[in-house]
């Protein structure tokens, strides 16, 4: 006995489903969950770079500047920027022949 004969049977007009309990709440819930899962999977594949970059770097913020005078905030920003700026002399150019 094959699964094909239990679920669907070929007729002259095409394939016909033999399951008559499609109005069962469990079947409806499973269908909705399946459709939502498919939609979320497609969105994840389309926007995975944005989503995971947001999760990775969006939660990591600098220290709180609440209650710190503006002059100290500007000094901190300049220190952070100077730490990011790198002198080109530190790089070694490698040429492949």
Swiss-Prot record:
Residues 44-97 are intravirion. Keywords: Disulfide bond, Host cell membrane, Host membrane, Host-virus interaction, Hydrogen ion transport, Inhibition of host autophagy by virus, Ion channel, Ion transport, Lipoprotein, Membrane, Palmitate, Phosphoprotein, Signal-anchor, Transmembrane, Transmembrane helix, Transport, Viral ion channel, Virion. The chain crosses the membrane at residues 23-43. It is a single-pass type III membrane protein. The record marks 37 as: Essential for channel activity, possibly by being protonated during channel activation, and by forming the channel gate and the selective filter. GO terms for cellular component: host cell plasma membrane; membrane; virion membrane. Residues 1-22 are virion surface. GO terms for molecular function: monoatomic ion channel activity; proton transmembrane transporter activity. The record marks 41 as: Seems to be involved in pH gating. Residues 60-83 are annotated as: Disordered. Its main location: virion. The modification Phosphoserine is found at residues 64, 82. The M2 protein from most influenza A strains is inhibited by amantadine and rimantadine, resulting in viral uncoating incapacity. Emergence of amantadine-resistant variants is usually rapid. It is found in: Virion membrane; Host apical cell membrane. The keyword Membrane applies. A lipid is attached at residue 50 (S-palmitoyl cysteine). Cytoplasmic tail plays an important role in virion assembly and morphogenesis. HAMAP family: INFV_M2 (MF_04069). When the channel is activated, one or more imidazole moieties of His-37 probably become bi-protonated. Forms a proton-selective ion channel that is necessary for the efficient release of the viral genome during virus entry. After attaching to the cell surface, the virion enters the cell by endocytosis. Acidification of the endosome triggers M2 ion channel activity. Homotetramer; composed of two disulfide-linked dimers held together by non-covalent interactions. May interact with matrix protein 1. Belongs to the influenza viruses matrix protein M2 family. This is Matrix protein 2.
